[in-house]
Structure formats: C-alpha cells, structure tokens
C-alpha cells in the first residue's frame, strides 16, 4: 500500500486579501470561550453496548461526532478562530490515526492523571488553542476518543459550509512546490466557483509521476494528470479484440 502524507494549503480570494492589507486594520483578538460550557449535554459512553454493533453503534457514533463538531464550531465562531481550530483538529487527526492513542484515552483502567499528562504534552508540542484542549478533555472524559477522526471530518464539513470552501485532495509522487499547489488551487476555484479552496496533499509512488486532483462532494470529480493514467490509456489503444482462430 502506498505511504500517504497529509498537509494543507489554503487559497483565499485575492480581493479580500488586498482589502485587508490596504486598510491596515489589525484583526481583533479572539474572545475566550469555553468548550466545556458549550459541550454540556453531549453524548457520553454507554457501558452496555448493543449487540448488533454494525446496525446501531455506527449511527450513534456518527450522531455523537456531529454533536461534538457542532459544539466546537459554536465556540470557534464565537472566538473568531475557525481557521486555527480546523488546523488544530487536523493535527489531532494525525495523532489519533494511531489506534493505540485512542485506546489509551478510552481505557477506564488508565488513571486520569496519566491521560491529563499526555493531553498537556500534546497541547504544548502542537501549540493547541485553549478551547481545543478543553475539547480534548471533554472527549476523553466521555470516553469518546475513538470517534475523534469522525469529529474532525464533521467539523471540516461545518467549516467548509460556513466559509464557502471547496476541499480538493492532490495526490503526487513527490511533494509539490507551493507555486504548483497555488496554480492547482486557482484552477479548482475557477472550475467550482468556490470562495475559498483548501488543498490536502498526499503521496502515492504508484502514480509513477504527475498528480491527481479529487474535489467535489465526496471527491466525486477527478483530474488525472498522472503518468500511470497515460500508460493505461496508451495500453488500452493497443489492446486487440479476441479473434477466434480456426484450426
């Protein structure tokens, strides 16, 4: 399986950026809001899980992820920190991609002090915002660490909706230069008419060379500029139909 790496590139409208620069205005400092306050009433762990996990647990997990993401987005909007929050969550998404991390936090036999120490270490290492740290603590207290990746996805959907952002995934053999990513973002923006474009990049050596761009709802649209695609097209041109031979 190809090794994948995730990064982020954001394109903002040139007009908005120019207006901000010409005005000389300094952005207002974000106000403080507590995720713990916004998170009251969020679903917590049920110690007696239903037997039909495939039918019941997954929908409940998705509903819980949506609830957490909605509560966190309210705090981020109130603080004026939507972009910083989605950036922090993408950092957490990479950390919690390791299942052992989520299992550690959801293990009821692990002392809370040990969990707190690790949360503090993560917060310091990745310079997380205070309300995001509060968010992690609430998730851990409710034994919901295993659904954190789903929470991040739901939050990104909310962020994209609020900011008019189109997300595109660029897959290449080697990491593309920033100017190349900027051109791709501009192309996606022109094709979709989106106000903003966020690019996520990942590496896949199986492409041989070139790149692909997936965008649209659930990545339904694809731009394939890979050498692998070109080879497949050339190969198909030389494929001959089966001709029966008479013996």
From Swiss-Prot:
Keyword terms, alphabetized: ATP synthesis, CF(1), Chloroplast, Hydrogen ion transport, Ion transport, Membrane, Plastid, Thylakoid, Transit peptide, Transport
Coiled coil: none
GO cellular component entries: chloroplast thylakoid membrane; proton-transporting ATP synthase complex; stromule
Chain's gene name: ATPD
Any one of the GO BP annotations: photosynthetic electron transport in photosystem I
Chain's role: This protein seems to be part of the stalk that links CF(0) to CF(1). It either transmits conformational changes from CF(0) into CF(1) or is implicated in proton conduction.
Assembly and binders: F-type ATPases have 2 components, CF(1) - the catalytic core - and CF(0) - the membrane proton channel. CF(1) has five subunits: alpha(3), beta(3), gamma(1), delta(1), epsilon(1). CF(0) has three main subunits: a, b and c.
Keyword Transport found: yes
A molecular function GO annotation: mRNA binding
Record's protein name: ATP synthase delta chain, chloroplastic
Gene3D superfamilies assigned: N-terminal domain of the delta subunit of the F1F0-ATP synthase
Species for this entry: Sorghum bicolor
Family: Belongs to the ATPase delta chain family.
Localization annotation: Plastid, Chloroplast thylakoid membrane
Top-level taxon: Eukaryota
PROSITE patterns attached to this UniProt entry: ATPASE_DELTA
Keyword Transport found: yes
Location of the transit peptide in the chain: 1-60
């Amino acid at each position: 399986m190809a090794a994948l790496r995730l990064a982020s590139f954001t394109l903002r409208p040139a007009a908005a950026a120019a207006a901000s620069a010409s005005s000389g205005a300094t952005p207002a400092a974000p106000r403080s809001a507590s995720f713990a306050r916004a998170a009251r009433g969020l679903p917590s762990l049920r110690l007696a899980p239903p037997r039909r996990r495939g039918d019941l647990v997954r929908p409940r997990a998705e509903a819980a992820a949506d609830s957490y993401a909605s509560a966190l987005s309210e705090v981020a909007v109130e603080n004026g920190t939507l972009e910083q929050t989605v950036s922090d969550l993408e950092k957490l998404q990479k950390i919690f991609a390791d299942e052992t991390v989520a299992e550690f936090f959801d293990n009821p036999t692990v002392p809370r002090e040990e969990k707190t120490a690790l949360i503090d270490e993560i917060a310091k290492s990745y310079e997380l915002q205070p309300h995001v740290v509060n968010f992690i603590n609430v998730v851990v207290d409710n034994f919901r660490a295993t659904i954190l990746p789903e929470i991040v996805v739901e939050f990104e959907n909310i962020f994209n909706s609020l900011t008019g952002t189109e997300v595109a995934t660029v897959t290449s053999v080697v990491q593309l230069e920033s100017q190349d990513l900027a051109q791709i973002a501009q192309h996606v923006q022109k094709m979709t008419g989106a106000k903003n474009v966020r690019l996520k990049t990942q590496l896949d050596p199986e492409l041989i060379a070139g790149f692909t761009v997936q965008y649209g709802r659930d990545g339904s649209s694809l731009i394939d500029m890979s050498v692998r695609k070109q080879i497949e097209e050339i190969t198909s041109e030389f494929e001959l139909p089966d001709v029966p031979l008479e013996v």
